[in-house]
Structures are given as C-alpha cells and as structure tokens.
Amino acid sequence: MKQLYFYSHGVRCAAWHLTAATDALAGESGRPCVVMAHGFSGTKDTALLGFAEPFAAAGLDVLVFDYRGFGESEGVPRQDISIPRQRQDYHAAIAAARHLPGVDPDRIVLWGTSYAGGHVIAVAARDQRVAAVISMNPAVDGVATLAHLRRTCGTGYLVRSTVNALRDVIGSALGRPAHMVPVVGQPGSNAVIATSGSEEAWLPVAGPTWRNEVRGRHALGVAFNRPITKAGKLNCPILVQPGTDDRIAPAVAARKAARRAGYWAQLREYPTDHLDFYDGPWQQRALADQLDFLKRDLAPTQGHLYETHSA
C-alpha cells in the first residue's frame, strides 16, 4: 500500500493506492481500479481497508481517499460537510486513478457507503466512462431520510439538528467560531447519529485521523441531497446494498434507486442497521457480495440483469 496525493480544486487530497495482487481481472488495457471513500465525516483509515484489501487480493487496484477538510487531506474549513465538494473530490480521485500505472482508465469502479453511497450514483451518472458502482447502506434521498429520522429518532432530534445548524450559520456570520456537533453519541444528545448502540458500533472501527465532530450547518443540506434523481441516468452495473433495519438511511429509498437504475441494478438487502456494515459477519457478507458482483460484471462477456435478493 502506497501513500499518494492528488489535487481537487487546488487542494491536496491524501490517498492510499493498493496494487492488485493478481492479474485475474486484467485485460489488454490494464487492471480495473476501485475508487472509494467513506460517508459523511468518515476517513480512509476507518474500516475501509476491510474492503480495499480483499479487492486488491481479487485483482483490482484500489484508490482510497480522504475528502478535502477531513483526515489527512488538506483544506479548510475542517470537518465541514459539503455534498458538492465531496462529489468534486470523487471526480478528482477518478482522474488520478485513471493515470495510475497498469490501470485501465475505462474500468473504474466507484465504491461508496452511507452519504458516499449516494455520491457514487451522482458521480457515475455524470461520468459515463465509469464501469461499475457499489452503493452500500446508501443515503440516496434526503427527504426520505428526514422523514425516516423523525420516525426512528423523534421530532426532538430534528429540532436539535435545526437549532445546531442555525447556531453555526448565524454564529459564523457574526464572526464566532464554528459550532461543532458530535458525529456519534447517545440517544437524546446533539450527535448526528444518536441512535442506541451507535457509539458502541462505530468507535471501535474509527481510525486515528477521524474526529467525532462536524460543523452544525450540515443539517441544512440533508433535504437537498437527492442522488436518487440521478439513478436513471446510470450507464453501468450498480450493486445497491441497503440494511432493512437501518435507522439512518431508509431501505425503501435504496430500493427505489435500484428500480430507477433498472436493467443495470442488482439489489441485495441485509437485516442490519446502518453501522453494522463496517465490522463483523454482515461486513463479511456484504463484502462477499461485492466481490461476486465485481468478478461477474467486470468480465466483458457477462450480461447484466436487474436482481433483488435478501440476505
């Protein structure tokens, strides 16, 4: 695994490059490469190697990167969630991956989880050269997410999130320091993910560069995050992997995104909550399905068919 850097809109982003351990999937133009990043505030050292290393062992190069303002990447403000910026970083990472030695520039796979599970749909819809997409526990419809959070976390959660967002925005206008909120916390707290068991599931897998805070203003952008509207524009196979017990990103929205992708989509469902995908048996099950998908759909002679499965 090598450390490398690329630039996104003039800012240096940090990444890891894992070279394929085998030529099993190599073609005349080179090897396929998976471009992957975490969701929301996640960093490349938080549970992503558990996917990246098996991909490399199976014959794919992998580029794992941090968004601007997070982890080892440069950029200010720090810990500020911006959906447009994160998608710009995906496009920049794709450009970097296409210039890696031995990589086939037309066999780039996008991998995303949570917020990034939506990003990869929007990015692939714009970049029609992308060869395949993996969208795990994806947040694809902000409107559906807010309605879902009201049911799972209560109206008080939405009120607290709105207050924190306004406090951050108004405070900044008045020259005050950024108002930060925890990413994970106990039920009833100001945390973005405040469902029971969240801290216990997330903190053990969190990497050393991850910080348990983001700017409060993130909440104002949730409703506008609707990559589901781009799903019908995909021109490549996509594996959609929702958790049926997900208390953050509703499975119903992921199913709808898969239906909109139509012919290109494979839907695999798991009886899991949002954070269960990063460690343990369901991580292994999701990974196995991803490897099967990649081996099948990166073979040029294979056809594609919309499929629905429950684990």
Residue ranges of predicted features:
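Alpha/beta-hydrolase
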Residues: 163-229, 236
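Short beta-strand/loop motif that positions the catalytic acidic residue
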Residues: 234, 240-242, 246
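Catalytic nucleophile-loop/oxyanion-hole region of alpha/beta-hydrolase
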Residues: 43-47, 70-105, 280-286
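Conserved alpha/beta-hydrolase "acid-adjacent" motif
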Residues: 247-253
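N-terminal cap/lid segment of alpha/beta-hydrolase-fold proteins
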Residues: 1-29, 279-280
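Conserved alpha/beta-hydrolase
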Residues: 54-74
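The serine-hydrolase catalytic nucleophile loop
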Residues: 40-53, 67, 252
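Primarily recognizes the serine-hydrolase "nucleophile elbow" in alpha/beta-hydrolase
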Residues: 92-171
